[in-house]
Amino acid sequence: MPSKTICDQVIPPNVRDRVQELDGDLNDGLITEKGYVKKKSKILFEHLSPDIQTKLKGLEDELKDEELTEKGYLNKVQSILAKFIETCSPVNGDTKEEASSNGKDDEKAESTVANGTTSNGSTTNGSSGSSKANGHTNGGYVQSSSQEETGTSQSEEEMDMDTPTSGKGGSKKKKKSKGSGGGDAGKGRKRKVLGDDERDGVEKKEGEKKDVEGEEGEEAKEESATPDEKTLRTSKRKRSPKADAKQPSIMSMFTKKPAKKEEEKMEESSSMEVDKKEMENGDNGKKEEEEPSGPGGKRIKKEEEEEEKAKVEPMSPSRDLRHKANHETAESKQPPLRCKECRQLLDDPDLKIFPGDPEDAREEYITLTDPRLSLLTGDEGDAMSYDERLQHKITNFCVYDKSTHICAFDRGMIEKNKELYFSGYVKPIYDDNPSTEGGIPTKRIGPINEWYTTGFDGGHKALIGFSTAFAEYIVMSPSEEYKPFWTAVQEKIYMSKILIEFLQNNVDPVYEDLLTQIETTVPPEGCNRFTEDSLLRHAQFVVEQVESYDDAADRDEVLLITMPCMRDLIKLAGVTLGKRRAARKAAAVKKDKKPVFTMATVTPLVSHIFDAIFKDQIADEMKAAASERKKRCGVCEICQAPDCGKCTACKDMIKFGGSGKAKQACKDRRCPNMAVQEADENDIDEMDNSSNKENKDEKKAKKGRKLETPLKKKKRAKVTWLDEPTEVTEERAYYKAAMLDDEKIEIGDCVLIHPDDPTKPLFMARVIYMWQESQGEMMFHAQWFVYGSETVLGETSDPLEVFPIDECQDTYLGSVNAKCTVIYKAPPNDWSMIGGIDDPETDHVIKEDDGKTFFYQKWYDPELARFEDYEVLMAPDDIPAHRFCSCCLKNERAQEKETARPGAKLEDQDDSSKVLYSSWHYKGNEFQIGDGVYLLPEVFSFNIKQKVVTKKPVSKKDVDEDLYPENYRKSSEYVKGSNLECPEPFRIGKIISIYTTKSNSTVRLRVNKMYRPEDTHKGRTAAYQADLNVLYWSEEEAVTELEVVQGKCSVVCAEDLNVSTDEYSAGGPHKFYFREAYDSERKCFEDPPSKSRSTRMKGKGKGKGKGKAKGKIAVEKEEEKESTETPFNKLKCLDVFAGCGGLSEGFHQAGICESSWAIEKEEPAAQAYRLNNPGSTVFSDDCNELLRLVMQGEKTSRTGQKLPQKGDVELLCGGPPCQGFSGMNRFNSREYSKFKNSLISSYLSYCDYYRPRFFLLENVRNFVSYKKNMVLKLALRCLIRMGYQCTFGILQAGQYGVPQTRRRAIILAAAPGEKLPFYPEPLHVFSSRACSLSVMIGEKKIESNNQWCLSAPYRTITVRDTMSDLPTINNGAQKLEISYDGEPQSDFQKKIRGNQYQPILRDHICKDMSSLVAARMKHIPLAPGSDWRDLPNIPVTLKDGTTCRKLRYTHKDKKNGKSSTGALRGVCSCAEGDACDPSDRQFSTLIPWCLPHTGNRHNNWAGLYGRLEWDGFFSTTVTNPEPMGKQGRVLHPEQHRVVSVRECARSQGFPDTYRFFGSILDKHRQIGNAVPPPMAAAIGMEIKVCLQTKTKRDQERAALEPVKEETEESMD
């Protein structure tokens, strides 16, 4: 294909308009010359010929290679582009048929009008019939004649809203006009003026749809084009081209134009006179209008209607296919036309035109001289010298632009130098009557220079003022036409007030909380109910007000803009931060202090630790901050603004005469983008995208290993033995003491050792025993200590505290540097009663630091970050004391536990090649014949192959992109909340035999395959309806190795039980039963064979291996064993920050405690706790106040409730809020004070004062990573200092039986002498994406103690399991008590309903969403994975009678291109790479405008308005179900509503009998903030194990005491 020549090139109308706007920006000084040339080149590049494109690329290369200066480059590019514009051809130079054949789209093909004339010989509306056409066509640029100096007519150059005209199809090719030929072509033609019915059609609201709007818009766009030379000439004027004098009013379009003579006279006059003339024409246009008369006018109209009908005829199929094939080369659809002044869409049915002023309306300057407005009597003298500006009020006002389009004054047009005027009745400033009575009708006041707001401080009514060149006007009531615009302004101002007060009064509020506040606020008079749509509509203004408020913040103060709710609002609405609107005067916002919470009650111990840690750190951080400049985005207006020269930072700058030491940026240039980004970086999403595929068996380091530490071999001093060896072997001689220079070292001493790396600190070790090798090397066995800084405590540790670890090594005596002292600090006998003492340092064992004295009190596990009591092991009888090492003994025991050990061999050896056993010991379990075992899913498979559930991809070709324009965004197959990637649960087998072969020592198990319901031919449906622990016996067998066995479980026949299956299942998590056998070949169920009912296979063993009994006897023995569990006394629990009691409920289910006391400040949550724990004392007071009273010796609270005293509390649990800090990685001095005064410090002080036996702190997963782990380290440091054993971990609630991803950080602590609990193993499989539970502490990765990382005993719990049995309800259902529809359908439902005497379903109620939100929910499909991207783009009548609009796509999308039908995909100018334009915003659309606006930057907002999947799970916590909230999918899978309170409660694992209190939002918040009871119950079961172990150990010690006394007496 031959390349296009210059003369063949076409500039489309939309590109022409963009060039014109760019020219105007250059003339106004809004853009630099460099930016102008670059943007102009970018706009025109695709329309240039290949030769010119190559030439421009060559110039770029020369500029990069520095062969060309930047100025020379810009000049050459500008010259090339100007030449191109001069010589380009018209866009409609071809006929309709030729355009079509060349692949042009229909709209361009039908553009046949040239030179402002129609095919019937009439000129277009508003154009002159003179010859001054300047060679300009309605489609684009043509070569201009140098003789023509005047511009085009008004409608051609300035107006984007000319009435389009059409040819009849244009069967003949139009000739391009040259020189003044364009004017000649227009001579003698009739001017078209609108008839009555046409004029009425312009002004009336849209009552019917017009199919030809798009076509008319295209031609209207093509009829207004301006040569580049004209733009350059007009740039010499004082006023910008955008505000040119030739811009007419809307009424002037309908008036008869002056004669040719008058026009020529006008053009010869000055530009200021033209302005005045146009203003007069605009105001008096109605008087000058003339109606078309005679048949000529009607004929013109009839011909045009016929042509419009021809336009909208559908294309033939063949043409349609051709059109699709060529859509890449032809522009399918162009952006709709906009008014150049107000930027409103010209075909918008809501576009309103100013109806005009009253006949007696005056000019502004005349009105201002009216004596009725004067406040003076004439005797004041020089009073006016003090008040330079007049101030009045105006009522019944209306704001409009130069085109008389009624428009909003708050959309940024004033800032863009657009002239806005207003009319109304001016009244004196003291007149508060909003009626027009007594007002002076005034027309065309302005233009408006600025607008401002007042009344932010305390008042409910916000006042708004306009400022013109002559006066200021406080606005009162709008006219009827302007009411919708005025209501929107009132909304946004009042909403700003609500938002700022909300941010002041709440700590770290989330977006859903903000929505609740907005939606529940009573709007001011005249405003509609506040909704999420109105919040998003006004987001830019509201955020700017918050930015203005933040301007008064101190440098290290947390900005309100960084609050979670504000960050989400900014992302959703696509707010541009850092805008500084020069022409809008915002009212000064009073900087109110946030409400001061009660000062934290902190014990001296906690306070001392905080002060000691932060004393040096804050100083270091301040130095670091001084040398570190604030980061900037470099894009926002704040970053690009100059320094103010007045603030403290500026005064320190060298350029302002300062020292330059601080190196801080101007206070007015605090970049909001970077502040928001830092806060975002500190957040960790609940759903981790990384899969947890690490296997514990692949850990490099095992617990109890010997450490190989690189040490210096070279002798540092002379070493000699001091005595004779205590034992001599062939290779070694053991000694008790040695002399190192002048220091004597004995067994049990501690020494400092030189590391091989001199940059590392000296190692510390205890000398366990010493010897000399046969080769002469003098050695000792070292048991290592680690410094506190080497543990998870890091920099928060006590510098004198060390921790022994289970690592030891043979070391050279010559590497010892010196002897040191390490003292064991034992807990005092009255440890539990000395909490909260005034001087916590009295128990310090080191009185003076000499650099070589240290102490220890806890043992440390580096792999799991556990601090435990140091336990000394006694030497076994077979190991001599002089070479006994407790670490080595622990190593051996750990190794034995990991190594399989055989039990008794069976006498009946059926196969000579095998050795049969009755049992084997492995990982602490004894596996016997007849036991059930857990196996990984890959160990064996079943004969029934289940259909793999995969999401069926929807072909994009099957989607109607015009109806579903956002569906193309659904490119990813992954759906958040889906279980498609969920692993399978363990396979379960029942051991038939255990054996090894004589040729191979590998232990093998032969097992019966036990089928789960989902493994049978019935599939998942059967699993959903069956108990979780039901199995089916099968005759199928599998052979596996003992090493792959994951655990042990109980598998019994239901007929062998002497209790019900429900009672049996309630006895523990690892109990399974079967009633039937399954035959996979015949796909049928049958009675199990008799051999399956034998709990132990018969066989005679050797030695102790005896045959086991059959049937109920063995089951009864197991039950008898369980019934002899060690009893223990339940703990007395204090639940701080109790909420509605999720933690307490879980501990009740575990049976470990009694909820004696609870503290909850929020009254609704406290009432809920009382309802569910009637025997508990619930305090609704501030926890700080209560602790202060107790520490002061008070016995009762202010309300007379009895306070717990020292020694009363045995279990302390709670989740203190960790809020109010910035997103920075470290504390600053202000935040340190804030943290010291936080609820975390209060909660730790509760622990210090009461010294309970067990302590639990629950928080969000982010808690462990916050501030570079500093918050976690401080909490652990305080617990260690108190004397507690402690650890931390991350748990996933979904792994304990709830259909929800909820990762939580849990700190556990146990008092000295107690056993520190481990974290519970997962019970249910869950999405691997959400199960990353490791934590990075510095460069160290801390793992969970869980062994079941790849699978778990039970399948995952789904949404279907949770709530499929609940009755159908509608949006806004409010009936608190209803009946169940039927019986429970799943095991989860059966358990969650409990044993109610009269089953009543409570709280199955849901939020009443607004009409628009309800319509959106109704149109979300029911298919899995559906969300907002599946919404149709249609107008819908809402339940309140209003109609939501169709979303309009007005811009090209650089990233996503066009649809398959050629439709645009951008809804804002930012889609094209430009700045956001406020006029692009759309509201009340079924597809929320904000989502496609910012979707490209935020993963297409996947999940908003998303439905839950029946087979999926809830995404994170739902504290307030909002379809556009951050909390994931909240729409019911099948019903058009958000999830109900009871459904949320079930997702957390609360029983149906559990009560909540308060409003529907209170109940949602109580549920969402609670700890899931199933997870709390799993933790409680681990605490229960520790209690039983401790009780059993105490009983054994008590039993040994009499024996010991008797032995001592006998010796005496």
From Swiss-Prot:
CDD domains: BAH_Dnmt1_I (cd04760)
Signal peptide: none
Catalytic activity: a 2'-deoxycytidine in DNA + S-adenosyl-L-methionine = a 5-methyl-2'-deoxycytidine in DNA + S-adenosyl-L-homocysteine + H(+)
Annotated DMAP1-binding domain residues: 7-101
Catalytic residue list: 1218
Coiled-coil intervals: none
Compartments it resides in: Nucleus
Comp. bias intervals (Basic and acidic residues): 94-110, 193-212, 222-232, 260-289, 691-708
Principal subcellular localization: nucleus
Bias (Low complexity): 115-131, 143-154
Molecular-function annotations in GO: chromatin binding; DNA (cytosine-5-)-methyltransferase activity; DNA binding; zinc ion binding
Binding site for S-adenosyl-L-methionine: 1142-1143, 1160-1161, 1182-1183, 1569, 1571
Family affiliation: Belongs to the class I-like SAM-binding methyltransferase superfamily. C5-methyltransferase family.
Protein name: DNA (cytosine-5)-methyltransferase PliMCI
Organism: Paracentrotus lividus
Gene name per UniProt: DNMT
